[in-house]
Amino acid sequence: MRLFVAALGLLCAGSTVASAGDLAAGEKVFRKCATCHTVGPKAKNKVGPILNGVVGRPWGAIEGFKYSQGGEGTLLAINEAAPKTWDVQTLTAYLHNPKEVIPKGKMAFTGLPKDKDIENLIFYLAQFDADGNQVDPATVVEQSAN
């Protein structure tokens, strides 16, 4: 019985660590994104929208950023048909293959092949609220995953 309880404890501890992500590794992955996107209190739209508060944010919600124009398969059309939120599941799919999620979106990035890089990037982005202030990323990820 003690062995079962110990094994269960290790299993639970392992899953918590795996879902938490690594901020330093996520920041390193974000460097690929930083050409077009910014985060933090002084973030500004560039080629891509600012990513403050992206985890849990509705699609197309950054004022002043020109998203892909309407038409089948674009962000605007998808929003009108079925409003979406950038939750963990949607972000994971998008970061793996952006064109699969938004076929006619204007983001040129082809995606991240490694699941761990995606997990770490989402965790890194989750630390920024809508104003770019730092918050607990684990709480944001947990709320977004539910």
Task: Indicate where each model-derived feature is located.
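C-terminal capping alpha-helices of c-type cytochrome domains
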Residues: T85-A138
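Sequence context surrounding c-type heme c attachment/ligation sites in exported
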Residues: L23-R31, K44-N45, P49-N52, Q89, ...
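The canonical Cys-X-X-Cys-His
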Residues: F30-V39, L121, L125
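Sec-dependent N-terminal signal peptides
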Residues: L3-S15
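Electrostatic cytochrome c docking/interface patches
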Residues: A13-F30, P41, A145-N146
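Residue-level signal for beta-strand positions within conserved beta-sheet cores that form or flank
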Residues: T16, V47, P103-G105
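Residues at helix-coil transition
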Residues: A13, T38, G56, H96-N97, ...
